[in-house]
Amino acid sequence: SEWLKNTDNQRALPRIQWLVDSLDRLKAYAEIAKNLNKTLRINLELDVGLHRGGFANIHALKEALDLAKQYPLLKISGLMAYEAHVAKMPTLLNMQANAWQTVQQMLYQAKQLFTEMGYKPETLTINSGGSQTYTMHAQQSYANEISIGTAFVQPSDFDLPTLSQHQPASFIA
């Protein structure tokens, strides 16, 4: 919250989306917003199978949206669904395709939930990982923003079939 007390940083607030992965964190951001008397844009993290954090399912996401409505200085700006696990799933027995469909189904359900709760999904950031899966997003995706950066330098752990058209940016001996 020290960073937010700086006047120059406060001017950047309308462009920043704060990633929230739990109800406790949502309450903490509400307290910060209240103390500063500033609106904070909140992007909720949905666990779509990686299990590294975020709201575990659509019901938990609804709980967060219900709670956010109680805080006038919190503005829901979107959703983040990190799906880095998908590209590393084996293709055997359609495991990768099934994981991808689960991600897409959860994104679809989240967009429907946003609509039911009075939000316009087309105005929200619906972000997904993208670095290892952007070619899959090009085929089918409910996300409207993906993060690709690391794919273009092709670190060795990104040597995956979904990125086979890339070559490493450099080799360090």
Which residues does each predicted region cover?
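Active-site-adjacent beta->alpha loops and helix N-cap segments on the catalytic face
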Residues: 25-32, 36-37
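Active-site loop/helix belt of alpha/beta enzymes
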Residues: 41, 47-163
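Generic beta-strand structural signal
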Residues: 14-18, 38-42, 124
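Short beta->alpha connector loops
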Residues: 22-26, 131-132
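N-terminal active-site wall of soluble small-molecule enzyme domains
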Residues: 1-10
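Catalytic beta/alpha-barrel core
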Residues: 1, 14-24
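Short acidic, glycine/Ser/Thr-rich loop/turn "cap" segments at secondary-structure junctions
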Residues: 9-15, 46-50
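Short, intrinsically disordered, charge-balanced linker/junction segments flanking boundaries
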Residues: 165-173
